[in-house]
Design a protein with these regions (language model features):
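Exported/periplasmic ABC-transporter solute-binding proteins
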Residues: 19, 24-294
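Sec-dependent N-terminal signal peptides of Gram-positive bacterial secreted proteins and lipoproteins
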Residues: 1-24
């Protein structure tokens, strides 16, 4: 009888120990992705693919072969992604390279670090343009045109560089000459949250050389910027998009380039990741970081 009791106790302790190990074991990856309509999400999903299927195909319901992982977060801003990743050791997400600070760690992708050189020569694959959107029919108010001219000038390029963004090599910046206005003008810019920091800086610099134009800023996301330009028949709105999505409603004008950085918590030992591994993480085929060699 005593022997039976000893065996039962030993068995219970073994089960309890296994359960404790399980509770304290490695947790699943917390997948962080931007909300639908985000230019950052569009740029990321166009590139991340497997077997000819992109994450964008999943977003647009063009495939039933794969689906997104169930356990995920979809914050509506760059700051939201950074907050989640910086506070969770098991999180992974993606943000504008210019937004990466000490609170998150950017991974190399396929062994390539996101830099000015690797973006301009195309070696770093997850990249996108920062676009200024104007009406396709050419309608634009003089004040909106003046702000557009400033943004495309050599003066603006200095501020773009200071934000860690990348000069678009196929465009030669011009010289800005402020237009003259007899009365105070007001224009609107609307769109990508990823472009908020650089555009706020450009608006501030513009105000110092053009005191007669007030620029009202709104950042509802890239899709919101596209809609704002389409809906403003007067051409007094300049849209902001952080991914290309051609349309007959607007013209895309490249302000600069940006890398979409894949980020993890600084405590994560992972340093490199492949496109295929990213696809598997975002579709749930890979659930733990220990399944990745990087």
């Amino acid at each position: 009888m005593k022997k039976v009791l000893v065996l039962l106790v030993a068995a219970m302790l073994a089960v309890t120990g296994a359960a404790a190990t399980g509770c304290g074991g490695e947790k699943d990856i917390l997948v962080v992705m931007r909300e639908a309509g985000s230019g950052t999400r569009e740029a990321f999903e166009k590139v991340v693919a497997k077997d000819g299927v992109t994450l964008e195909d999943i977003s647009k319901d063009k495939t039933d072969k794969y689906s997104f992982v169930t356990k995920r977060e979809e914050p509506k801003s760059t700051a939201g992604v950074i907050t989640l990743v910086s506070s969770n050791k098991n999180a992974i997400g993606y943000v504008s390279l210019s937004s990466v600070g000490e609170d998150v760690k950017a991974l190399t992708v396929e062994g390539v670090e996101p830099t000015t050189e690797t973006v301009q020569d195309g070696d770093y694959k997850i990249q996108r343009p920062f676009l200024l959107l104007t009406r396709a029919d050419g309608t634009i108010t003089p004040a909106a045109q003046d702000f557009y001219n400033f943004c495309m000038s050599a003066t603006a390029l200095e501020h773009i560089d200071s934000e860690g963004l990348i000069e678009y090599p196929d465009r030669t910046p011009g010289t800005y000459v402020a237009a003259e206005f007899d009365t105070k003008q007001t224009i609107n810019i609307s769109g990508s949250t990823s472009m908020r920091e650089v555009m706020t800086k450009l608006v501030g610099a513009y105000g110092k050389v053009q005191p007669n134009v007030e620029v009202k800023e709104a950042y509802p996301g890239s899709s919101g910027g596209r809609t704002a330009v389409k809906d403003d028949a007067t051409g007094n709105t300049i849209g902001l998009a952080s991914a290309s999505s051609p349309s007959e409603n607007y013209k895309e004008n490249t302000l600069c380039l940006d890398a979409v950085a894949v980020v993890v918590n600084p405590a994560n030992k992972l340093e490199d990741i492949s496109i295929l591994q990213l696809f598997d993480i975002y579709t749930g085929a890979v659930k733990k970081f220990s399944e990745i060699d990087g």
